A protein has these predicted regions:
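Membrane-embedded helix boundary and interhelical linker motif in transport proteins
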Residues: 4, 26-76, 80, 210-211, ...
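Helix-loop-helix "hairpin" substructures at the membrane interface of multi-pass membrane proteins
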Residues: 10, 135-212, 236-241, 305-309
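Alpha-helical transmembrane segments within multi-pass membrane transporters and channels
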Residues: 20, 54-100, 107, 241-246, ...
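Pore- or pathway-lining transmembrane helices of multi-pass membrane proteins that form conduits
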Residues: 36-40, 85-109, 217-229, 257-276, ...
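Cytosolic-side transmembrane-helix boundaries in multi-pass membrane proteins
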Residues: 111, 115, 172-179, 183-186, ...
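Membrane-interfacial amphipathic/re-entrant helices at transmembrane-helix boundaries
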Residues: 1-15, 44, 55-62, 88-93, ...
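Inter-helical junctions in multi-pass inner-membrane proteins, predominant
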Residues: 1-12, 136, 157-162, 188-234, ...
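Transmembrane helix-bundle core of multi-pass membrane transporters
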Residues: 85, 90-160, 187, 252, ...
Length: 341
C-alpha cells in the first residue's frame, strides 16, 4: 500500500521536475520560480473548478485550463524578464527568478488571501479500492496512470516531432542550432511554455490531495531540484525514475518519522553526486556547459574491497532510519534529525 501511495505522490513531483529539467536543459537557467508555477496551478484550478461546477468534465477542464494559463504566465516571465538575462552571470539569473517568486507570492496573497484552500474531490474518483486490509483512493490510481501518460506524451513529443528534435539539439549545442537558422528566442519561449504547463498541471492535479496554500512553491521546489539532479539534467525518463524513488522514500520514511524524509532525500542526492555526478540517466557531456571546463569524473572505487565497503556504507546509511528507533530513545532521535535538517 505504501508503495502505491509513493507512486501517487511522485506523479505531481515528476511533472514539476520534468518541466524544470526541460527549461534548464535548453536555457541553462536554474528557474527558482518554477515552484511558483506549481502553486499558481493549484490556485487557478481551485478558482476554475468553482466556476465550472462539480461535474467530472468541469473538474478536468479546470485542471487543463489552469495548466495552460500557467503556461501563458510562464511565457510572459520568459519574454519580459528571462530573455534579457540569458547571457548574465548565474547569480543574476537566480536573483531574477527569486524576484519572480516574491511577485507571485504577493499576487497570490492579494487575489486569494492568506487562508489555506481545501481542494475539491475529483468527481467520480472520490471513493477507495480495497487492497488487502487497506484502502487506496481511486484518485491515487488516476494520478499514477496520469504520470505514465504524461511520460509517454513527453517521449513522443521529444522523439517524434521536429520541435522535439530542435529542443534536444539546443540542449546539446545552442550555438549550432542558432547557426542553422532556428529562431532561438521563440524556441526558448516554447520550451518555457511547456515547462510551465507541466508545473501548473502538477499543482492542479495535486489540489484534491493537499489543497492550496502560500507555501506550496517552497515546499515543492527543493524536492524538484533533487529529482532533476538525481535523474540527470535534461533527462525526462531520469526525472520520472528519480521522482518515483523520492516518492517511495517519502512514503516509507514517514512511517518512521515525518521529518526524516528530507534527510533521506538529500542523502540519496549526495550519494548520486559522489558516484555519478551527471545523474542516473544524464550524460557526462551534459554535466557542464562552460567551454573549456571538463565534466567532473565520478568517484573511482578501486578494487572490489573498496566497492564492497562503499556498498556496505550506503546500505547502512539507508537502513539507519529503520534501526535508530530500536537503538536510541525518541528524544535523541528527534534531536539528531533536527541537526541533520
Amino acid at each position: 500500500m505504501q508503495f502505491l501511495t509513493g507512486l501517487a505522490s511522485a506523479a505531481s513531483l515528476f511533472m514539476v521536475a520534468a518541466g524544470l529539467s526541460i527549461i534548464f536543459g535548453v536555457s541553462r537557467i536554474v528557474n527558482f520560480a518554477h515552484g511558483s508555477f506549481y502553486m499558481l496551478g493549484a490556485y487557478l484550478a481551485y478558482s476554475l473548478g468553482q466556476r465550472f461546477g462539480g461535474s467530472g468534465l468541469g473538474f478536468w477542464s479546470a485542471v487543463v485550463l489552469a495548466a495552460l494559463l500557467v503556461g501563458l504566465i510562464g511565457v510572459l516571465v520568459e519574454v519580459l524578464i528571462l530573455r534579457r538575462i540569458y547571457q548574465a552571470p548565474e547569480l543574476f539569473q537566480l536573483l531574477a527568478t527569486f524576484g519572480v517568486v516574491l511577485i507571485v507570492q504577493d499576487a497570490t496573497l492579494w487575489l486569494w488571501g492568506p487562508e489555506d484552500l481545501i481542494g475539491p474531490r475529483a468527481p467520480g474518483l472520490d471513493s477507495a479500492i480495497r487492497i488487502g486490509q487497506d484502502y487506496l483512493p481511486e484518485y491515487d490510481i488516476a494520478l499514477i496512470v496520469l504520470s505514465a501518460v504524461v511520460l509517454l506524451a513527453l517521449w513522443l513529443l521529444f522523439r517524434k516531432t521536429r520541435w522535439g528534435t530542435l529542443v534536444r539539439a539546443a540542449t546539446q549545442d545552442r550555438e549550432m542550432v542558432a547557426a542553422l537558422g532556428v529562431n532561438q528566442a521563440w524556441l526558448f519561449t516554447s520550451v518555457f511554455f511547456v515547462g510551465a504547463v507541466l508545473a501548473g498541471l502538477g499543482g492542479a492535479v495535486q489540489l484534491p490531495k493537499g489543497g492550496a496554500d502560500l507555501l506550496l512553491d517552497m515546499n515543492i521546489i527543493a524536492a524538484a531540484f533533487v529529482v532533476v539532479v538525481v535523474g540527470g539534467m535534461g533527462s525526462i525518463t531520469g526525472a520520472f525514475l528519480a521522482a518515483v524513488l523520492i516518492g517511495e522514500l517519502n512514503a516509507f520514511g514517514v512511517l518512521i518519522f515525518p521529518q526524516i524524509t528530507l534527510v533521506l532525500m538529500f542523502l540519496v542526492m549526495a550519494v548520486v553526486l559522489v558516484i555519478r555526478p551527471w545523474g542516473l540517466l544524464g550524460r557526462p557531456e551534459d554535466a557542464t556547459h562552460t567551454p573549456g571546463v571538463q565534466a567532473q569524473e565520478p568517484l573511482r572505487l578501486a578494487g572490489w574491497k573498496a566497492q564492497a565497503g562503499w556498498l556496505v556504507l550506503l546500505l547502512g546509511l539507508l537502513a539507519l532510519p529503520w534501526l535508530t528507533p530500536w537503538l536510541i530513545d525518541e528524544f535523541t532521535l528527534v534531536l539528531a534529525i533536527e541537526i541533520l535538517i
